[in-house]
């Protein structure tokens, strides 16, 4: 475990919201960092490190990272609902935990924003969300990981489980 902690700590020390080292290929291509599923996976892992260790540096990093992207009105820099891309829902999973811990109302507003994408996502005849608007009628396994847990969490917490039948 020590080697993992050391690796994660070094990675975080070298990372900022503008230049996360775990997403180095974007930096090498000269692309601006934006709201994305890779950062969502990593920040979720950082929050798990906090939950396990109770070391505030992990919470601070995760909060600073997501806080950088989320405006007070809940809008998210680099996030476009219009893309209809289920990948973009993944980072939204971090908002629930950060909202619980910090109480920042902007995180609650951002949760609602990400949830609003669920309502407009195109679907296959079977009811599954398309992976992306640009891939009609395609369902990808990682897309289910990206979207369904967020959808379920939102329904459980904020919508009286009204759409559970849609999720199952």
Features from the language model and the residues they span:
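Low-complexity, Ser/Thr/Pro/Gly-enriched N-terminal "stalk/linker" regions
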Residues: 1-70, 105-113, 121, 126
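Surface loop/turn signatures of beta-propeller and other carbohydrate-active proteins
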Residues: 6-13, 24-25, 75-80, 130-136
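Carbohydrate-binding/catalytic loop surfaces
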Residues: 21-37, 44, 85-98, 129-146
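Amphipathic, non-membrane alpha-helical segments in soluble helical-bundle scaffolds
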Residues: 32, 59, 81, 108, ...
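Well-ordered alpha-helical scaffold segments within catalytic/enzyme domains
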Residues: 40-55, 90-104, 148-160
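Blade-loop segments of beta-propeller domains
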Residues: 63-100
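Asp-box/WD-like beta-propeller blade repeats and closely related beta-sheet repeat scaffolds
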Residues: 107-145
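Loop-centered beta-sheet repeat module
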Residues: 161-168
């Amino acid at each position: 475990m020590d080697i993992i902690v050391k690796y994660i700590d070094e990675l975080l020390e070298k990372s900022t919201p503008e230049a996360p080292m775990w997403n180095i290929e974007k930096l090498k291509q000269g692309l601006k960092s934006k709201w994305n599923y890779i950062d969502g996976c990593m920040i979720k892992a950082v929050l798990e490190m906090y939950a396990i260790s109770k070391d505030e540096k992990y919470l601070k990093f995760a909060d600073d990272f997501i806080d950088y992207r989320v405006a007070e009105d809940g809008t998210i820099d680099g996030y476009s609902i219009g893309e209809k891309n289920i990948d973009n829902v993944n980072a939204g999973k971090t908002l629930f935990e950060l909202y619980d811990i910090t109480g920042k109302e902007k995180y609650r507003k951002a949760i609602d924003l990400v949830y609003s994408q669920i309502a407009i996502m195109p679907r296959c005849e079977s009811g599954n969300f398309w992976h992306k608007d640009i891939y009609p009628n395609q369902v990808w396994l990682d897309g289910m990981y990206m979207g369904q847990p967020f959808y379920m969490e939102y329904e459980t917490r904020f919508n009286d489980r009204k759409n559970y039948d849609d999720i199952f």
